[in-house]
A protein has these predicted regions:
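Acidic, glycine-rich loop-and-beta core segments that form the ion-binding/anion-interacting portion
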Residues: 168-198, 202
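Glycine-/charge-enriched secondary-structure boundary and capping motifs
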Residues: 2-7, 24, 112-131, 140-147, ...
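Short, acidic Gly/Pro/Ser/Thr-rich loop/turn segments
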Residues: 62-65, 158-161, 182-184, 235, ...
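N-terminal amphipathic/basic leader segments beginning at the initiator methionine
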Residues: 1-30, 35
């Protein structure tokens, strides 16, 4: 039985190296003026200049959660996942999502499947308050068994409102926003462990929470120093806010039961769990310590389950109460 994500077939380190090889070719593919890149180290979305602001763009897919959702006849929500994985990245740079397009690759045409995917995509865009502008459908039986779903989101942010992590400082408060489950990461390992229990299955395929409305409300009221969308790599996403600091999580959010079950079932080491899954933590917000109470009150009014989970310290990396 697989005890790590790599043993299940996904080597995060190898994936990072492959991505770096791709990104290394990007430098010459730029322009000047409108469309010129605005570089963010480890940013969650790409930014290009446009007038007095910046266009934010990101692309992502749902991954092998699609297979589990298909097995459990829950395909009506994977469109929400697809939107969420993109718009939650956009807001990390301060951008408001405006438009979304999808890409569906199919082994064979399937009208019922497409209707379910479309319903989820539309619901996700409603939750994110962005326009579902179109997309592309490709029937490619030589390439795909079943189907795949991905999408691209575009947003806008004024130049002065870009969140680049430069305001992060020692003693900043870290606020955690609860996830709705594994969201859309770790499913290659999850599928190796899942035993068919319907109650657990419902937890595992719950759609990824969309934080757009609550975070945009927070950005309008509080000076946010940085945001991190906790996706693939788990806690490793926190230093993406600014790698020059140490992120101390000494009061973590409760771990949902599904993660406890996965850990026991697979006999997975805690460090591997926190590297693979969000463990109940969907988004992290860094604010000045003096703004933490007001930020928590606002997030509660917006319907988020949020709490003070830690602080920023001198150093590098992440310290977590469950791993010390």
């Amino acid at each position: 039985m697989a005890r790590t994500y790599a043993e299940a077939g996904v080597d995060i380190d190898a994936s990072d190296r492959a991505t770096a090889a791709l990104v290394a070719q990007f430098g010459s593919a730029t322009r000047k003026g409108d469309g010129a890149p605005i570089t963010l180290e480890n940013g969650f979305a790409g930014l290009v200049q446009l007038g007095a602001g910046a266009l934010a763009v990101c692309t992502d897919g749902v991954g092998t959660k699609l297979l589990l959702a298909h097995e459990l006849s829950s395909l009506e929500t994977v469109g929400i996942d697809c939107v969420a994985m993109n718009v939650n990245d956009l807001i990390c740079v301060g951008a408001e999502p405006l438009s979304f397009v999808d890409y569906v690759a199919l082994e064979e045409p399937d009208a019922e499947l497409m209707a379910q995917l479309g319903a989820g995509l539309a619901e996700g865009c409603r939750q994110a308050n962005c326009t579902l502008s179109g997309g592309e459908t490709a029937v490619v039986p030589e390439l795909v068994r079943g189907f795949d779903l991905a999408g691209t989101a575009v947003g806008w942010v004024t130049r002065e409102a870009i969140i680049d992590g430069s305001r992060v400082a020692v003693a900043d408060a870290l606020i955690g926003l609860a996830s709705s489950g594994p969201h859309s990461n770790g499913y290659t390992l999850i599928r190796r462990l899942f035993d068919g229990d319907p109650a657990l299955g419902a937890q595992l395929v719950a759609p990824t929470r969309i934080y757009v409305r609550s975070v945009l409300a927070l950005l309008a009221a509080v000076e946010v120093h940085a945001l991190a969308h906790v996706t693939g790599g788990g806690l490793e996403n926190l230093p993406r806010m600014n790698p020059s600091f140490r992120y101390v999580v000494d009061n973590p959010l409760p771990v949902p039961p599904a993660f406890d079950w996965l850990q026991r079932k697979g006999d997975i080491a805690p460090v591997e769990m926190y590297r693979t899954f969000n463990m109940g933590l969907g988004m992290v917000v860094a604010v000045a310590a003096g703004d933490a109470v007001r930020a928590l009150e606002l997030l509660a009014r917006e319907g988020e389950t949020a709490q003070l989970i830690g602080h920023v310290a001198a150093g590098e990396g992440v310290a977590h109460a469950a791993l010390d």
